[in-house]
């Protein structure tokens, strides 16, 4: 999980979602692409 100021989908499998007011990127294919805005 990377914590970044700016989160972007890194591949076609990345999804941008909002949980409890925090923007996150989850990826079904490459778990390394997981990100959270912070």
UniProtKB/Swiss-Prot annotation:
Is the keyword Cytoplasm in the record?
no
One GO MF annotation is: structural constituent of ribosome
Keyword set for this entry? Ribonucleoprotein, Ribosomal protein
In terms of Pfam families, this protein maps to: Ribosomal_L36
One GO cellular component this record assigns the protein to is:
ribosome
Against SUPFAM superfamilies, the record matches this protein to: Ribosomal protein L36
**InterPro entries, from UniProt?**
Ribosomal_bL36, Ribosomal_bL36_sp
GO biological process: one example: translation
Query: Which family does the record claim for this protein?
Result: Belongs to the bacterial ribosomal protein bL36 family.
Q: Which HAMAP family match?
A: Ribosomal_bL36
Give the protein name, as stated in the record.
Large ribosomal subunit protein bL36
């Amino acid at each position: 999980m990377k914590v970044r100021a700016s989160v972007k989908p890194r591949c076609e499998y990345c999804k941008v979602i909002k949980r409890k007011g925090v923007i996150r990127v989850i990826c079904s294919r490459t778990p390394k692409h997981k990100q959270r805005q912070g």
